[in-house]
Design a protein with these regions (language model features):
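Catalytic domains that recognize anionic headgroups
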Residues: 17-502
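Accessible peptide chain termini
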Residues: 1-2, 496
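N-terminal Sec-pathway targeting helices
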Residues: 3-17
Length: 502
């Protein structure tokens, strides 16, 4: 979930004028690309010494099992699938957190939330000031950096030259909280920026945040009805639901929707995925027309997944840490640098994205990151065993949540997951709840087998408790208050109001 918007609105005309001026300046000065790394040209640079462009495509709330490249039968993702055919799929990629405000900082800093410190909506995003980011490393090595984030501000704007969060800003500068987001607008802005810098010899880093699959499910025609055109029931599953069940009751299965209604909601979700995919296709087509495809590394991932009824958790994320929430797509396409059409089974983590992209750019990976480069794993080189993935839950918005026993950071669900096993810690007084799943035998996480694998339980428990012990907020049972504008934004996305937590 986005935090309160504190970034000054930057009109697109100003963005393009600044970009054009920068391009002209570098051309006039004859600026070329710096040599990479401490020892000259690095592995990520091509024959000309030019580092690759880097395009980070993040789709809010995108489940990997709803993509065609991972076996989904509906045609939700032809453009993402095309990228997957040219790249590497990390089949078991795990997010560091189940909510946006924690997850994106982990992607761009390469560390888990207990280290970067942003744990709840409402926190001052200045907590990230001074934290090394992917953007900072790339800019220090000759990259231009632009982000189109659709209202997101979690303190990551500081290192971008141009950062456009303005999709929620109206024509008169007022804040507009609207239930539908148009991912096409995001691609249009990015394409305009890319065209404005044609001829600029510097590589670009472009971060795109698409967020159509996030509730409320309200894709424009034809996507909204693409996968269930015959539906004739009462629900639209967007901001105008009629009848409107209490959101908290619906999320946690207390208001039981008939199976046909759930099917329709999933069809709406799939339509949103297809809408985001088309926006990605528009951007990739433009990059290809500019002749930049062969010079561009592309990553497709998500901040978290979405519950679609598993574990009685409907159309939401962040409260629990089961596979539909923590498992995300991770596709890396790197022409000439990584194999094509390869699927990797060992666990990967979203905190691995930063060091992986730095490595692919031919830049030495900084020390102090918890993530590690996935390049050796993708190339089939000896990489050592994959470290287990940590994840944590987000802020509890709904009093109806039957499995949130303690508020604040102290009450966060926490998880460690390796290639086969998952251990979940659920804080509760006087004793916590522990759940342990053998994902190879039970991918749906239906049987707690904590008594059957004592050695694996001990191994993952030791790793998890070490993280808890080092967490400065581990005993904090308070949550920061929500500013009025943030609360209004959260209300538009279904997190507060209508019988839910204030």
């Amino acid at each position: 979930m986005p935090g309160p918007r504190r970034v000054t609105a930057v009109p697109l005309t100003v963005i393009l004028a600044a970009a054009a001026a920068m391009a002209a300046l570098f051309l006039a000065c004859g600026a070329g690309m710096p040599e990479g790394g401490a020892g000259g040209r690095a592995a990520g640079a091509g024959a000309s010494g030019r580092r690759p462009n880097i395009l980070l495509l993040t789709v809010d709330t995108l489940r990997p099992d709803h993509l065609g490249c991972l076996g989904y039968p509906r045609r939700t993702s032809p453009h993402i699938d095309a990228l997957a055919r040219r790249g590497v799929i990390f089949r078991q990629a795990i997010t560091a957190a189940g909510r946006t405000v924690q997850s994106f900082p982990s992607i761009l800093t390469g560390v888990n939330p207990p280290v970067h410190g942003l744990r709840h909506e409402g926190q001052d995003s200045g907590i990230l000031e001074g934290r090394l980011t992917l953007t900072r490393v790339l800019r220090d090595n000759g990259y231009d950096a632009f982000a189109v984030t659709q209202g997101l501000n979690v303190g990551l704007h500081r290192d971008f030259e141009l950062y456009d969060p303005d999709i929620y800003i109206g024509p008169d500068g007022e804040k507009v909280y609207r239930p539908s987001r148009d991912d096409r607008d995001a691609s249009v802005k990015a394409i305009a920026w890319l065209r404005s810098r044609r001829g600029n010899p510097r590589p670009f880093f472009l971060w795109m945040r698409y967020d159509a699959p996030h509730w409320p499910y309200a894709a424009p025609p034809p996507y909204g009805e693409m996968f269930d055109p015959a539906y004739g029931g009462p629900h639209t599953f967007n901001a105008g639901q009629k009848p409107e069940p209490r959101r908290g009751d619906m999320i946690f299965g207390m208001t039981r929707l008939p199976p046909r209604e759930v099917e329709h909601a999933v069809a709406h979700y799939d339509g949103e995925v297809a809408f985001s995919d088309q926006a990605i296709g528009d951007l990739m087509k433009a990059i290809d027309a500019m002749g930049e495809t062969a010079r561009t590394v592309v990553v497709v991932t998500a901040d978290h997944g979405e519950g679609l009824g598993e574990h009685d958790y409907f159309f939401e994320h962040g409260a629990y840490l089961y596979e539909p929430i923590v498992r995300v797509p991770l596709i890396v396409t790197a022409p000439g640098l990584l194999p094509e059409g390869k699927v990797i089974d060992p666990v990967a983590r979203t905190i691995d994205i930063m060091p992986t992209l730095i490595d692919l750019a031919g830049i030495p990976v900084p020390e102090g990151l918890q993530g590690r480069s996935l390049v050796p794993l993708a190339r089939g080189e000896d990489h050592g065993p994959a470290p287990p993935a940590y994840s944590e839950s987000g802020r509890n918005y709904f009093k109806e949540n039957p499995r949130q026993f303690i508020e604040g950071t102290a009450g966060k669900w926490r998880m460690m997951r390796d290639d086969r096993f998952k251990l979940i810690l659920i804080p509760r007084d006087p004793e916590p709840i522990w759940e342990f799943y053998d994902l190879a035998a039970d991918p749906g996480e239906t049987m707690n087998v904590i008594d059957r694998f004592p050695d694996d339980v001990a191994r993952l428990r030791s790793a998890l408790l070490a993280i808890v012990a080092g967490d400065p907020g581990r005993d904090d049972r308070d949550e920061p208050p929500l500013a009025d504008d943030l609360e209004e934004r959260l209300r538009s996305l279904g997190y507060v109001g209508g019988g839910d937590r204030p």
